[in-house]
Structures are given as C-alpha cells and as structure tokens.
Amino acid sequence: MYDSDEADAWKRAVDLGIEREHRAQPVVLDPVGAFECKLTFFFRRPKSHYGKGGHVKASAPVCHVSKPDADNLAKLVLDRITRGGRIWRDDSQVAKLHVEKYWAITDARIGVYVSVQRFEGSEA
C-alpha cells in the first residue's frame, strides 16, 4: 500500500483496534511461537454499485478486486500488530496467512477484521 492519506487512515484504525482489543482481552507476548492470521477487509462500495432506492444492484460484485492489493494490505496490518508489540516479536512469526477483500454491504461494516491464533501446523 502506498504511503497516502488513505494508508495513514488504515494505520490509525488498526492501531485503535489493537488497543481496544488488548484492553478488552490482554494478550501475553510470544517472542518465538508461530501464528495463524486471517484478515478480512471490507471496503465502501462506489455509487455505481447502487440502483434505485439505494439498494445494491444484483450485478454489483461481492469481491473487491481493485487496489489496494491484498498483500500490501496484509503487510500494513501485520506491521502495525508488530509495532504494537503485544502479540508477537516480529510478523515473520506468522506461519499461515489468509486474506480476503470484499465490498461492504453497509458502511458500518467497513474496515478490517483480524483473527490471530497460535498455529500448531503440521508438516505438509
């Protein structure tokens, strides 16, 4: 993701979310363990996705397939989690990563939903 006003807004939102979640459910830093992380991004739909009455058109896409790229979004979030220093020492500890991008159904859903858990993977 480019260092733009939009990227800065995402960074602030991620930082606030990390702080809020940590207050609600404190986590102990694990400096060596492996983690699994799922990131689900929801973006505001453009006006062209809406028809009469403000309803989403049946032809409007579900998946967000334009910029920013999924890998850049993931890097931003993982770097912010690392910067927060509350879960892992370094985002290289993320052994499994799943990223999804969608258009939000409502503006209330816009943002990123993050799920992190310890990864007890097996050899492939």
Task: Give names to the regions the model predicted.
Residues M1-A124:
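Acidic, proline/glycine-enriched N-terminal capping motif
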